[in-house]
Amino acid sequence: MSKLTKRQKTIGDKIDSNKLYALSDAIGLVKEFAVAKFDESIDVAVQLGIDAKKSDQVVRGAVVLPNGTGKTKRVAVFAQGAKAEEAKAAGADIVGMDDLAAEIKAGKMDFDVVIASPDAMRIVGTLGQILGPRGLMPNPKVGTVTPDVATAVKNAKAGQVQFRVDKAGIVHGTIGRRSFDTAKLQGNLAALIDALQKAKPASSKGVYLKKVAVSSTMGVGVRVDTQTIAA
């Protein structure tokens, strides 16, 4: 059996993997052991009490984190006429229709979010095999297919994150960076949990928020007492 490194032993001494920590303490521990030479993201994993195999229990949505994500997102918008001008005024980085679709088909995808007005979906629909696997396909369920493209752009720029439960019933998300103070990370996680609560399927029975854990990009995971997450 290999010996534990000094760092692993220190983590083992300070973090009990079976203990539920108050949110502020959990975040403090994650930040303490996030020692990479870059500003690590602070991530969360939420185990939901749903059956992800059932179509009526797929949890999906979007939420604007009140304190942002620490990352500036580039936004592409499919719109024309007045809607295109509204998108540009709201801060969209790329706006187009057939010309934007041609760039995407050519492999030029210098953006993190794609938004579309409903009338543009005839064009966007042809890009499903390109955008879909990358998680970029616009969808009305997360507010990225909408006649109000300006608000969608502003939300994306303000720190909106999308979430979707995986096959194991877990939602993964990022709530900020190590450089964020604890209060901002707490506020962002509370907003995400509130959005998950609102997205609870009517057919879900029993405990809905089963487990919550926070971690950093290269660091350790710490379990959170859900009773300490104030929405």
From Swiss-Prot:
Similarity field: Belongs to the universal ribosomal protein uL1 family.
What GO terms describe the biological role, i.e. biological process, of this protein? regulation of translation; translation
- Can you say what this protein is called? Large ribosomal subunit protein uL1
Matching SUPFAM superfamilies, A to Z? Ribosomal protein L1
Keyword set, alphabetical order? Repressor, Ribonucleoprotein, Ribosomal protein, RNA-binding, rRNA-binding, Translation regulation, tRNA-binding
MF terms from GO for this chain are: rRNA binding; structural constituent of ribosome; tRNA binding
The source organism is: Polaromonas sp. (strain JS666 / ATCC BAA-500)
- Share what the entry says about its subunit structure, partners included: Part of the 50S ribosomal subunit.
> What GO cellular-component annotations does this UniProt entry give?
cytosolic large ribosomal subunit
What function does the entry list?
A: Binds directly to 23S rRNA. The L1 stalk is quite mobile in the ribosome, and is involved in E site tRNA release.
TM segment ranges: none
